[in-house]
UniProtKB/Swiss-Prot annotation:
Protein name as annotated: Myotoxin-1
Organism of provenance: Crotalus durissus terrificus
Signal peptide interval: 1-22
Summary of the tissues where the protein is detected: Expressed by the venom gland.
Source organism superkingdom: Eukaryota
Family: Belongs to the crotamine-myotoxin family.
Disulphide connectivity of cysteines: 26-58, 33-52, 40-59
Alphabetized UniProt keyword annotations: Antimicrobial, Disulfide bond, Ion channel impairing toxin, Myotoxin, Neurotoxin, Potassium channel impairing toxin, Secreted, Signal, Toxin, Voltage-gated potassium channel impairing toxin
Function comment: Cationic peptide that possesses multiple functions. It acts as a cell-penetrating peptide (CPP), and as a potent voltage-gated potassium channel (Kv) inhibitor. It exhibits antimicrobial activities, hind limb paralysis, and severe muscle necrosis by a non-enzymatic mechanism.
Gene3D superfamilies per record: Anthopleurin-A (2.20.20.10)
Entry-linked InterPro entries: Myo_ane_neurotoxin_sf, Myotoxin
UniProt-listed PROSITE patterns: MYOTOXINS_1 (PS00459), MYOTOXINS_2 (PS51345)
Length: 65
């Protein structure tokens, strides 16, 4: 019975996180996953697909200074 409780807790925590937070490689670079059609205008950085889902790319907004 304890195994079922542990399994339920693990599944609950696994589905609790937001989908946008699942793409660690992109977020480590300071970016977010955007539709591929979006153009990253300088001073933004376009990191390409990285670990973003299908038809999306990693883009970091520039500082705008």
């Amino acid at each position: 019975m304890k195994i079922l409780y542990l399994l339920f807790a693990f599944l609950f925590l696994a589905f609790l996180s937001e989908p946008g937070n699942a793409y660690k490689r992109c977020h480590i670079k300071g970016g977010h996953c955007f539709p591929k059609e979006k153009i990253c205008i300088p001073p933004s950085s376009d990191f390409g697909k990285m670990d973003c889902p299908w038809r999306r790319k990693c883009c970091k907004k520039g500082s705008g200074k």
